[in-house]
From Swiss-Prot:
Localization annotation: Cytoplasm
Subunit text: Monomer.
GO biological process entries: arginyl-tRNA aminoacylation
Main location: cytoplasm
Keywords: Aminoacyl-tRNA synthetase, ATP-binding, Cytoplasm, Ligase, Nucleotide-binding, Protein biosynthesis
EC number(s) reported in the record: 6.1.1.19
Protein known as: Arginine--tRNA ligase
Species the sequence originates in: Mesomycoplasma hyopneumoniae (strain 232) (Mycoplasma hyopneumoniae)
Short motif 'HIGH' region, span: 120-130
GO function terms (MF aspect): arginine-tRNA ligase activity; ATP binding
Enzyme class, broadest EC rank: ligase
Gene name of the encoded protein: argS
Pfam families documented for this protein: Arg_tRNA_synt_N, DALR_1, tRNA-synt_1d
Keyword Oxidoreductase: no
Similarity comment text for this entry: Belongs to the class-I aminoacyl-tRNA synthetase family.
Length: 534
């Protein structure tokens, strides 16, 4: 309805050759002034040299002549327009939802989107920081696909450089400690996961490398490849346990092996040499300073391979319309330089970067700390032992990506209406149980009169708006908020309405069916089961 009203107003302005800026046209949901309200006449009256009340009245007359299923339109000084939806429109909304079923809320945007997320270094188990990026990325991909886009989910493996050297040294030292006292490198990873990896390595190779040194290139190569493989397999297993999938795992080291880094940098403009190093003039394109691509010792920087990686994505066979990267907030200093690099070849408009904030985990009022370096990492494995997948996905996604998440294990595990996820699943289970024991007559005309019915139906229709909004602002938490509001409205409706035996029973059952459909569709986008019973 909101879209219909907007389109009718735009059509009116164009037919009358009046000035309108469509981006400033606002149709707001209203509680006190009809179902929807707009100040469009106030905004554009001056530009069109028309009195705002007169313009509002003219718009009203035109829209009443359109087939918009509006019961009435009222004008309020100095030019507000209030729209009241026809009772028939509420019936139409419920019928539409039931008819479309699992397709209600879908669009056909048909953009190709490369979505890169998680991309954790294969130097240990996934922890809560990685978890948030994983959940955000997976849910966003679900919603973008539901909106008719083609989404390519990519995990970038940072398997090149100093962090991998540190991993090899750490695992090798822990392996040696199986046989004898052996010192850890100064920059060693200290987590239990490194000890676990060394033991895995021992199960495969026994004492084959007991007397080896990392100066032995063959030994170094085996420790490097096997350590990465062991951790990457665990990362994939953790993601699978959260129902998170990828289309491809891309390797940084593979970019170097196939000389794609060198080839992409060779065609990069605004490159210059200074102090025996090779630089990119990113300061010309919004970065704070120029950045080194190749150090004076000939070593490529991480930035150089990252540029190549982005060019490879853009020029891939998938041919994406744009890229979305989901990074931790600690990468904030990296955003400007990456966008600047793409600006050098006029591709910056193809990249959106989401920076998500930290997760703090609480249990019994105490916060768990996370530090892979200090051996106190709280991993996804640990969390899955305390709460289930559905709870993890809901509570990790219920805040905007740019806000801190405080994950309360006690609340997430609580079987109570205080738990928002339980409340939503309870509403779905209530609807499912009622419908399982009842029959809807689809041929009967639907009728909705009571205020709690029309409010609930209006909320159902908002599902389409929420989905579309998320495709534009990427704030997946809007879906959590919406589902909670819908569940609360339905639970109130259910508790305060006599449904079975009501003279309008068929309509109320149909409304219940519509609620069940929308709750299920929304939960599916979150990757959460819609429970039939609790």
């Amino acid at each position: 309805m909101k879209k219909k009203i907007s389109q009718a107003i735009i059509k009116f302005f164009k037919n009358e050759n009046l000035i309108i800026d469509e981006s400033k046209l606002i149709i707001e949901k209203s509680k006190n002034f009809g179902d929807y309200s707009s100040n469009v006449a106030l905004i554009f009256a001056k530009q069109n040299k028309i009195d705002s009340l007169k313009l509002a009245q003219t718009i009203k007359n035109q829209l009443l002549s359109e087939n918009l299923n509006l019961e009435k339109i009222e004008i309020a000084p100095p030019g507000f327009i209030n729209f009241f939806i026809s009772k028939n429109e509420y019936a139409n909304i419920v019928s539409e939802i039931i008819q479309k079923g699992e397709n209600f809320g879908r669009y056909s945007l048909q953009k190709k989107i490369n979505l890169e997320f998680v991309s954790a270094n294969p130097t240990g188990f996934l922890h809560l920081g990685h978890l948030r990026g994983a959940v955000i990325g997976d849910i966003l991909a679900n919603i973008l696909e539901f909106s008719g886009n083609f989404v390519f989910r990519e995990y970038y493996i940072n398997d090149f450089g100093s962090q991998i050297d540190r991993l090899v040294g750490s695992v090798f030292s822990r392996y040696q400690q199986i046989f004898k006292k052996f010192p850890l490198p100064e920059e060693a990873y200290l987590g239990e996961d490194i000890i676990w990896c060394a033991q895995k390595f021992f199960q495969i190779y026994a004492n084959k490398f007991e007397n080896s040194s990392l100066d032995d290139l063959e030994a170094y190569k085996i420790f490097r490849e096997k350590s990465i493989e062991i951790f990457l397999d665990e990362i994939k297993a953790d993601l699978a346990n959260l129902s998170i999938k990828f289309d491809v795992f891309s390797s940084e080291s593979e970019l170097f092996r196939t000389e794609k880094v060198q080839k992409n940098l060779a065609n990069l403009p605004f490159v210059y040499k200074k102090e025996e190093a090779i630089w990119l003039k990113t300061s010309k394109f919004g970065d704070q300073k120029d950045r080194v691509l190749v150090k004076k010792n000939g070593e490529f920087t991480y930035f150089s391979s990252d540029i190549a990686y982005h060019f490879e994505k853009i020029n891939s066979n998938f041919k994406p319309d744009f890229l979305i990267n989901i990074w931790g907030a600690d990468h904030i200093g990296y955003v400007d330089r990456m966008k600047a690099a793409l600006k050098t070849v006029n591709l910056n408009q193809k990249l959106d970067i989401l920076l998500y904030q930290l997760v703090k985990l609480f249990k019994n009022g105490q916060e768990f700390k996370m530090s892979k370096r200090m051996g106190k990492t709280f991993t996804i494995k640990d969390l899955l032992e305390l709460v289930d997948q559905d709870a993890i996905r809901y509570f990790i996604s219920e805040r905007s990506y740019n806000s801190l998440v405080e994950f309360d294990i006690g609340l997430a595990a609580k079987i109570s209406l205080q738990n928002p996820l339980f409340l939503i699943q309870y509403a779905h289970a209530r609807a499912s149980k009622l419908l399982a024991n009842s029959t809807i007559a689809p041929e009967k005309k639907l009728k909705f009169e009571a205020e709690n019915e029309t409010i609930l139906i209006s909320k159902l229709k908002q599902f389409e708006e929420i989905v579309l909004k998320i495709t534009k602002n990427y704030k997946i938490n809007l879906l959590n908020k919406y589902l909670l509001e819908l569940a609360n409205l339905f639970n109130s409706f259910y508790s305060n309405s006599k449904i079975i035996g009501n003279q309008n029973q068929n309509s109320l059952l149909s409304l219940t069916k519509a609620v069940q459909i929308v709750l299920k569709n929304g939960l599916k986008l979150l990757g959460i089961k819609a429970k039939e019973r609790i």
